[in-house]
Amino acid sequence: MSTGFLVEDVLHLATDEKQSKSVDSRISFGCGRVQTGSFLDGAAPNGLFGLGMDKTSVPSILANQGLIPNSFSMCFGSDGTGRISFGDKGSPGQGETPFSLRQTHPTYNITITQVSVGGNAVNFEFSAIFDSGTSFTYLNDPAYTQISETFNSLAKEKRETSTSDLPFEYCYVLSPNQTNFEYPVVNLTMKGGGPFFVNDPIVIVSSEPKGLYLYCLGVVKSDNVNIIGQNFMTGYNIVFDREKNVLGWKASDCYGVNNSSALPIPPKSSVPPATALNPEATAGGISPASAPPIGSHSLKLHPLTCALLVMTLIASFAIF
């Protein structure tokens, strides 16, 4: 639990048009002062940008003011850049799956019907929440065991078992002179048949005091809820359409989302993807269009500066 202050301020936005206009809106947001419970694990956030379905969230406020359609998108680039666009309802050709809404405390919950690891597909159904405020993906059984054990059986490098200081159970040792490696590709099939190719299911970390580099399957075992975190959303423009109650996704580098001219993001000002570990992360991944059973990675390492549950996103705020 987090306690602190709930305040109101003005959010300055720009319309996503050739002649962009400035739009100001009063919003509410919280600043956490005292953190307890799960917020003490890893790093305690100062606050989260409210994007949920509650009436006090930023998209709800903007929609209720008549400024936007009741929808928004978030784009997560493989180099750490990103964009959030309020009012975005997606684009033609995007994948879609319906939200499975609860009557109380609705979340962005979807249903997954198939998991494929390294080309080995298994049909079973489970629900998961798409949560951009969580850095990694959390799964309980049977999904966690199915994905992790299949990944482990196909990984070529030696597994590192002494990883008690890491949240990941399945990590593999890279040799000192190794500059690239291959790993089993993880793909999901959503309810309705839409494929969701996970571009970057791994995390590169440094192991001290051994001085080794490891790559880990970026999935943490959960005791209860399944969460698709930011790492599985990398390389996509993710649309949260609250009017149609569907989740949409389409491959994107996040620099030319919907050909927007509003507040462009300069490529050289990027920051690495969010993580909780002070490790290194790689840029790149496999193309969703090809989705081979084996992906490859080059060790292009950058220091990370952000913490679990604090999504570091170079965000261009736009209203559609």
What are these model-predicted stretches?
Residues 260-261, 266-306:
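C-terminal GPI-anchoring signal of eukaryotic secretory precursors
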Residues 180, 213, 290-320:
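Long, low-complexity, charge-dense
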Residues 1-275, 312, 318:
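Active-site or ligand-binding cleft "flap/edge" segments
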